[in-house]
């Protein structure tokens, strides 16, 4: 989408880390919502993912309506590219186009931090909020419940 104006506009926004909404998962992983789709005019979403050592994450899955990218800041998390798991190091970047099978976890003995960028900027945080609520309350989820949650947030699970 292009900007059609002639003079530009005052529209830049900034947020401090203290102002960012955070979510702590049952595993201890902290999701920091740096930029949500609602704050970027749905251009993209950017999250900072902070995982404790030896923490599971997302098994193989794909998305039909958005791409996802990962950039490792610290630690050695592992990423699944649809065929193999690779232990990454700081500076590693993974781009996953729509339909690309992927997953992530931190099976290393040290904490790991990475950025997750997705485009367009859908309300992806709702998926992680739901997972955190399920973990915090211990709510039982039937196969049908999981299927509904995955469908609502474009999370198509596969083996891997």
Where are these regions (language model features)?
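Basic/polar N-terminal segments that are highly enriched at the extreme N-terminus
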Residues: 1-21, 158-160
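A short glycine-rich, His/Asp/Glu-containing loop-to-beta-strand
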Residues: 20-60, 66-67
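Short, conserved beta-strand element in jelly-roll/cupin
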Residues: 48-52, 62-79, 117-119
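Hydrophobic small-molecule pocket/channel-lining residues, especially in calycin-type beta-barrels
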Residues: 55-56, 63, 77, 126, ...
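A generic "binding-loop/recognition-motif" signal
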Residues: 65, 84, 100-101, 110, ...
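Short acidic-glycine-tyrosine-enriched beta hairpin
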Residues: 83-101
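Double-stranded beta-helix
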Residues: 107-160
């Amino acid at each position: 989408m292009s900007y059609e104006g002639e003079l530009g506009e005052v529209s830049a926004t900034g947020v401090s880390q203290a102002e960012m909404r955070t979510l702590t998962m049952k595993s201890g992983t902290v999701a920091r919502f740096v930029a949500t789709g609602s704050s970027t005019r749905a251009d993209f979403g950017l999250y900072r993912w902070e995982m404790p050592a030896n923490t599971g994450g997302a098994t193989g899955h794909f998305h039909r309506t958005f791409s996802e990218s990962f950039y490792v800041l610290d630690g050695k998390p592992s990423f699944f590219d649809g065929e193999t798991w690779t232990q990454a190091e700081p500076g590693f970047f993974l781009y996953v186009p729509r339909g690309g099978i992927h997953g992530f976890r931190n099976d290393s003995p040290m904490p790991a931090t990475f950025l997750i960028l997705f485009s367009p900027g859908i309300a992806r945080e709702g998926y992680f909020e739901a997972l955190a609520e399920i973990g915090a309350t211990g709510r039982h989820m039937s196969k049908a419940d999981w299927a509904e949650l995955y469908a609502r947030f474009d999370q198509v699970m596969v083996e891997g």
